[in-house]
Amino acid sequence: MKKRKGLLIILDGLGDRPIKEFGGKTPLEYAKTPNMDKLAKLGILGQQDPIKPGQPAGSDTAHLSIFGYDPYKVYRGRGFLEALGVGLDLDEDDLAFRVNFATIENGIITDRRAGRISTEEAHELAKAIQENVKLPVDFIFVGATGHRAVLVLKGMAKGYRVGENDPHEAGKPPHRFTWEDEESKRVAEILEEFVRQAHEVLERHPINEKRRKEGKPVANYLLIRGAGTYPDIPMKFTEQWKVRAGAVIAVSLVKGVARAIGFDVYTPEGATGEYNTDEMAKAKKTVELLKEYDFVFLHFKPTDAAGHDNNPKLKAEMIEKADRMIGYIIEHINLEDVVIAITGDHSTPCEVMNHSGDPVPLLIVGGGVRPDHTESFGERECMRGGLGRIRGHDIVPVMMDLMNRSEKFGA
């Protein structure tokens, strides 16, 4: 029995809702996607719910679920995964947080992403904060991808029951950090002091002085959320399925998830996780890894960002960019030897500007797949696909079965 290889492609935030200016089509339906449409005709379509129907999923919990883990059991907060993703070496008693560089004016958050500052700017600002902020505990503060950063409070894991200061929408003041016990109260007090000192550092930083002169939103505030400790992973993905697994990822959170479950992670030069990401660099690296690994995971972020920015046209353009990436890959592999799944980790409808509980389009193609009669890859066509509506949790088992790598249950 021939064992095939697997390629899981996640177009982050792929799913959407009908857009009036597109004549009622979604960005995926509106975009020109000849390569994914070709695969749709050769494969089988369906929909998947990352967690459960109607439940908006975070990128962290969604990816854990899609890789076959129950997020209700293993998830311990986003922050630790972000920290793993930026390559930090952490101890089990550390407490980590996801941080956004944001813009505050007169006590009101006016931009939760500081005009989507660049990764380079974020890293420079984070360095200044690390060097100038003084706290009663040891801490690590580093830039991640784009407007994102990671904060680690060393030895403070017992204080994980702490709230956040992120209001989750512009036009509101930041929250005060809440707590549930004495340990988390101390963490809340440390975070308040950290944010206060960081604000002072950011206000006078040359990067923000330059952004002010250019009329851009300044990154003068920190929004902190997602307190996390080490995830409770019962068995690595690589151990469970007895495969060598590699991943092509630019975004720190998703890198962290992949590393936590045993993937070797690669970020080719030019892969930024932003709108300017080099999709061909990611495609070429994916083809290269398929020669070496049994299972490859390819993550593409910009589709999600456009949904958060309520920009349907840009989302369609990013989907077309992803389609070119996929086109290169299928030109350089033998589909009979590989099982490919293409989906999103969740839906990010432009009208919502956030994750929603809408089901996500799913396409599976390659050796062993029984094609249905669908013609293109889009939300409505996926509704009539042969896969039906499945749990995100089921995607990898379906792939592994088609790859002839699953084991029989029973005699």
From Swiss-Prot:
Reactions catalysed: (2R)-2-phosphoglycerate = (2R)-3-phosphoglycerate
Recorded GO MF terms: metal ion binding; phosphoglycerate mutase activity
Class of enzymatic activity (EC top level): isomerase
GO biological process: glycolytic process
Gene3D superfamilies on file: Alkaline Phosphatase, subunit A (3.40.720.10), Metalloenzyme domain (3.30.70.2130)
InterPro entries named among the record's database cross-references: Alkaline_phosphatase_core_sf (IPR017850), ApgAM_prokaryotes (IPR023665), Metalloenzyme (IPR006124), Pglycerate_mutase_ApgM (IPR004456), Pglycerate_mutase_ApgM_sf (IPR042253)
Coiled coil feature spans: none
This protein's pathway: Carbohydrate degradation; glycolysis; pyruvate from D-glyceraldehyde 3-phosphate: step 3/5
Entry keyword annotation includes DNA-binding: no
Keywords, comma-separated and alphabetical: Glycolysis, Isomerase
EC identifiers of the protein: 5.4.2.12
Pfam families, per database record: Metalloenzyme, PhosphMutase
Entry annotated with the keyword RNA-binding: no
Family to which this protein belongs: Belongs to the BPG-independent phosphoglycerate mutase family. A-PGAM subfamily.
HAMAP family: ApgM_A
Cited function: Catalyzes the interconversion of 2-phosphoglycerate and 3-phosphoglycerate.
UniProt name for this protein: 2,3-bisphosphoglycerate-independent phosphoglycerate mutase
Species this chain originates from: Thermococcus gammatolerans (strain DSM 15229 / JCM 11827 / EJ3)
Gene designation: apgM
